């Protein structure tokens, strides 16, 4: 392991393992990469065991350039943060085929003095930074201000990232992190081909969903031993793809969840396993939106000091008692028909009779949206019911 892609994938599955515990039989959707970049903002100012724990969970020391002698004034290898920043800049750069809206910020109770050098570093490296706010005597108003900021940064898509009563007069610092994604496929699904088809939630229960359909050349793989198959659906521009991991059986998701790991995923999506074939693809139209308080998840993973009185954030504030009271995360994405190239009806019609292989996503599955250049997992999800 030695790349941001590998680090994000390892972290992704560690988070998933914990989220599964708290959200049995529910849809799950989150952005491992942006959680890492949010924790990196904290890591900049963390010291001693607080810093060690974050590093152990996120594995910053596995990144190229981690131990370089060129130290930033923030006391952390610049390369780690600049490589995260470069990917963030790359994916959030405005273009006509996909859009990312990111809101990531620390909010500290205003009575804590914040070190100017920390503010400078976090602004340079993460464009977001830290705001001081009045939790002590106006907690609900502070919550409203934070929610409004996130809503405006995400074009109105993510509302109320902080739930009522999630902050109070004792709140020291809150980490908020929210991301929205909309993208065009390389090959569009035609609107008129979308129709209501039953999605089998369990062996006994099904519900109608809007099922998109197309025939085309796609990279696909069947894993007989794992009883599942994988499909890659490229977004326009080729820098990102959605990967769908579909169990063979309606009830096969649990086995897949138990099996999946960084090593397995790397093996499954490798070029010597995936092969391009002409297939019929059925994929539900989906709107994914989930919000999490990641405090318990990160604590279960081993970041405990950060959320307790043992926190050492002396690189952020000279006040010894600063800690994080809550880490809020929200992710939103839409999967719909729009794409860059539309395949003509005549071409598709001629294919329909000659193509027999199907990839029919009509029962629970796992999926991820991956940045192909760096192999970073931008989003990971479980769909029990679209």
From Swiss-Prot:
* Organism superkingdom: Eukaryota
Per its record, how is this protein called by name? Ovalbumin
Region forming the signal peptide = 22-48
PANTHER family annotated for this entry? SERINE PROTEASE INHIBITOR, SERPIN (PTHR11461), SERPIN B4 (PTHR11461:SF186)
Question: Which species is this UniProt entry from?
Answer: Meleagris gallopavo
Family (UniProt): Belongs to the serpin family. Ov-serpin subfamily.
Where does it reside?
Secreted
GO cellular component terms?
A: extracellular space
């Amino acid at each position: 392991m030695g790349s941001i892609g590998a680090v994000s994938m390892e972290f992704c599955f560690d988070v998933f393992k914990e989220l599964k515990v708290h959200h049995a039989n529910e849809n799950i959707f989150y952005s491992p990469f942006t959680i890492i970049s949010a924790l990196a903002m904290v890591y900049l100012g963390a010291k001693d065991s607080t810093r060690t724990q974050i590093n152990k969970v996120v594995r910053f020391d596995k990144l190229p350039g981690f131990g370089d002698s060129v130290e930033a004034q923030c006391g952390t290898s610049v390369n780690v943060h600049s490589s995260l920043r470069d990917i963030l800049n790359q994916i959030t750069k405005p273009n006509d085929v996909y859009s990312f809206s990111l809101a990531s910020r620390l909010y500290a109770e205003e009575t804590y003095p914040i070190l100017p050098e920390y503010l400078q570093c976090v602004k340079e490296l993460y464009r977001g930074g830290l705001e001081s706010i009045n939790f002590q005597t106006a907690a609900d108003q502070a919550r409203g201000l934070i929610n409004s900021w996130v809503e405006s940064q995400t074009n109105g898509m993510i509302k109320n990232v902080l739930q009522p009563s999630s902050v109070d007069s004792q709140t020291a610092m809150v980490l908020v992190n929210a991301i929205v994604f909309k993208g065009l496929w390389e090959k569009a699904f035609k609107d008129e081909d979308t129709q209501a088809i039953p999605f089998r939630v369990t062996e006994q229960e099904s519900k109608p969903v809007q099922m998109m359909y197309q025939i085309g050349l796609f990279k696909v793989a069947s894993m007989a031993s794992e009883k599942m198959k994988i499909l890659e659906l490229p977004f326009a521009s080729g820098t990102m793809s959605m990967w769908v991991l579909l169990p063979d059986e309606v009830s096969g998701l649990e086995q897949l969840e138990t099996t999946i790991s960084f090593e397995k995923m790397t093996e499954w999506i490798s070029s010597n396993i995936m092969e391009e074939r002409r297939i019929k693809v059925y994929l539900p139209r989906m709107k994914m939106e989930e919000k999490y308080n990641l405090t318990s998840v990160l604590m279960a993973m081993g970041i405990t000091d950060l959320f307790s009185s043992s926190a050492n954030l002396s690189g952020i504030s000279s006040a010894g008692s600063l800690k994080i009271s809550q880490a809020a995360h929200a992710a939103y994405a839409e999967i719909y028909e729009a794409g860059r190239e539309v395949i003509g009806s005549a071409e598709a019609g001629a294919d329909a009779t000659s193509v027999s292989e199907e990839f029919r996503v009509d029962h629970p599955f796992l999926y991820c949206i991956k940045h192909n250049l760096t192999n970073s997992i931008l989003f990971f999800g479980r769909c029990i019911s679209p």
